[in-house]
Amino acid sequence: MVNEFFNLSGRVAIVTGTSRGLGQYLGRALARAGADLVITSRDKTALTDFQHEIEDLGRRAVPLELDVRNYDSIQRMASAAAEAYGKIDILVNNAGCNVRKPSLDISWDDWNLVLDTNLRGTFFVAQAIARHMIPNGYGRIINIGSVTSVFGYAGLAPYCASRGGTKQLTMSLADDWGPHGITVNCLAPGWFKTEQNKVLYENEPWVRYICDRIPLKRPGQPHDLDGAIVFLASEESRYVTGQTLLVDGGISTGATKATVDE
């Protein structure tokens, strides 16, 4: 019975940004739940190993080139994905980037890189895929946000702006597309050890600092997202839309002491 609740057999999921890191973990979780995948990267050759890994799980994986900063690339990917499977059920908008600099050092190009990738790209990929979902009256769109969707951090101005925008965008699209049977939610990880931020975890004082503020006292590991992504992609999330699900070990509680240790 439990397996039936979260069974994605027969579903087709697009996961963007799957050449490495978090996108691959999310794709694995969906494949293990039974979904067939479309996997994307700016360099399609970078997807070969991951494609074989998904096929070894007994699922299909169609690799497609995608640059989320290029409108024509988005349209080509959406058309090719729909042609490959005949339908698209699930979209995981995972492709993203970051620039870590003091706000006074952020350049025009830095800002555009992050916002174009994380926010504009997220919208136009969702738009392109929704056009294929609407005729079928069904869809699950999961935008990958961050704890920075709800909190600001020094040195991350463009990233925080983009992820805050993702949260608001999620609510707007949920309102727009709900009548068509499409749910739109935001999955927002906290401080996770990923390739994108591995340099932070080489700094032991920083690790101690951040873990002290996480009630569960450890950074997230990518597999901590497995249950959340499968739930949001499944039939069991049918009445959940427009929401931001924080998977952050509790850091969003504020996680500061109101008492002093004796």
Each PLM stretch: what is its role?
Residues 2-5, 151, 230, 241-262:
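Short C-terminal tail/terminal secondary-structure segment
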Residues 12, 19-21:
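Conserved glycine-rich cofactor-binding loop
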Residues 102-103, 107-115, 210:
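Substrate-binding pocket helix/loop in short-chain dehydrogenase/reductase
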Residues 104, 151-157, 179, 217, ...:
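Active-site loop immediately N-terminal to the catalytic Tyr-X3-Lys motif
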Residues 126, 162:
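Active-site helix of classical SDR
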Residues 131, 175-179, 238:
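Alpha-helical segment proximal to the catalytic Tyr-Lys
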Residues 146:
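Residue(s) in the substrate-gating loop at a strand-loop-helix junction
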